[in-house]
Amino acid sequence: MAKAVGIDLGTTNSVIAVWEGGEPSVVPNSEGNRTTPSVVAFTDTGERLVGQLARRQAILNPKGTIYSAKRFIGRHFDEISDEARAVTYDVVEGDGGAARFKVRDKLYAPEEISAQVLRKLADDASKQLGERVTEAVITVPAYFNDAQRTATKDAGRIAGLEVLRIINEPTAAALAYGMDKKEHETVLVFDLGGGTFDVSILDVGDGVVEVRSTAGDSHLGGDDFDRRLVDYLADDFQQENGIDLRKDPQALQRLFEAAEKAKTELSSVTQTQVSLPFITADASGPKHLTDTVMRSTFEQITSDLVERCLGPVQQAMADAKVGESDIDEVILVGGSTRIPAVQALVRRLTGGKDPNMSVNPDEVVALGAAIQAGVLKGEVKDVLLLDVTPLSLGVETRGGVMTKIIERNTTIPVRRSETFSTAEDNQPAVDVVVLQGERERAADNRVLGRFQLTDIRPAPRGEPQVEVTFDIDANGILNVTARDKDTGKEQGITISESSNLDRSEVERMVQEAERNQGQDQALREAVDARNELDAVAYQVEKRLAELGDAAPAHEKARAEMLVSDARAAVKEEAGVERVRPLTSELQQVLAGLAAHQGAATADGGPAQHAATGGPTSGGGGGDDVIDAEFDKG
């Protein structure tokens, strides 16, 4: 049976875990790390890099390195102006107003980028587990709307995964924490990740994890803290040197990396040094950035971000009807919860309670997702997960107001119906506009979709009865139907168009991802083969130098010719069909020279044989890279 895994698809880093041996465990990637950077890069040579390899080259390739794709997934271009300004790559408007990433004249959907991260996670885990990973539970922020959830599911499909379930990150964390808890506890999960903030109140105990409320801010995360530090450093430098480093993509990328490092260090020390030599240059020569950042300064420039966490916590507690004294445990999730000011805020909001430090904030979400995968596959018994919908859902009714059909924090799956009528005499059709949000005015909420119910029999206004049904499945994805009670005619919509991709686009991306996997594998094989050839050529040259005149003339001439051919093949980026025979010939020559050297050094100790195999530039194929106008009746 194929392995089902849990995946925490994060803004900054992602984690994959599996249920095995009666417990969930994180599966390391091919580099041996338990977290994988959610970064994808496209190089000048056409190579696609994912994870740590992509992150390492970001400074030299700021326009071709895509990070924080999660902040754009399932969103339209007119929604992401702030996020687009905060990255070094180009975010443009695609078909239908969708957000797209532009790299070397090609457009990529956020779903495609996320799919590359998911594919690497699944491929690496397959190698570690010894069997193919094809099914996954993927987590999303609790405050993700329907479009973002559908887009995440699309990303999984593009990656070649069957997405068993989409679950909320705080819920997954509580599942991992509370699975073995026998006593009933009320738990607050405070989840501040790279790009999103969620808070959930849950009841945990005796195999049941029930979400009572959730709230959040899908535009707040660690990236925002980094940006404040970048602006602080850049403003200081501009004041001193008259140069705005934010206008240079390469300098900006270096600033972001330095800011992230400084933020991390300031969680454990009270001051840190930022040193970026040769950050830029002007007519007077090169410029260096050196600055000392105090924790107190960092807290001052990010204080409003910390305070933005206050509202969602208070909202969640009010919705769940709990006070400070009712909270038994506080679980911190996400790397940004290590910031001391954030931890101080949590203590302040929970009556001074210290957070539970027994869970790893970077891994707990993936572990919970793996448990849910085990539940869905029948491997985990006696565990019940009761999640909620984070935002209210309804329709636009007469006067341009939103009439809610499903209130926020309703346990899912759920099915609710309301009956509406026409607003005009002899009205032949009604337009159903499906909305998500908490505002009274329809225009202030997000439109998830719209459809029309036609052929309503002529009748005075208020007489026809139209039943509108909202059905949310366990993934939090919505189906809406409208039925004319008189004629029985029905029309409906699955809110999957709320994704920025239609079905044909998803299919195209699936096929392209599969093609690219083969191309990327071939590219990686060619690079590794050339690296191996270069290494063997170097060893032959070294051996010739060591032998000097002791090398037989005919072997020396052949070796020098082959080395010259090897250097040309590497320089010309030759394919494996040319490179591998050359490597084989050079290895034979090297073996022959080694024999001569052995004879020449027989009376002076053994010859030192250098390794000849293996690529010199890391990694194998593991990184291949990848309106209605109704009146209520």
From Swiss-Prot:
Acts as a chaperone. It holds the Pfam family HSP70. Belongs to the heat shock protein 70 family. GO terms for molecular function: ATP binding; ATP-dependent protein folding chaperone; unfolded protein binding. Keywords: ATP-binding, Chaperone, Nucleotide-binding, Phosphoprotein, Stress response. Induction: By stress conditions e.g. heat shock. The modification Phosphothreonine is found at residue 196. This is Chaperone protein dnaK2. Residues 624-633 have a biased composition (Acidic residues). Residues 600-633 are annotated as: Disordered.
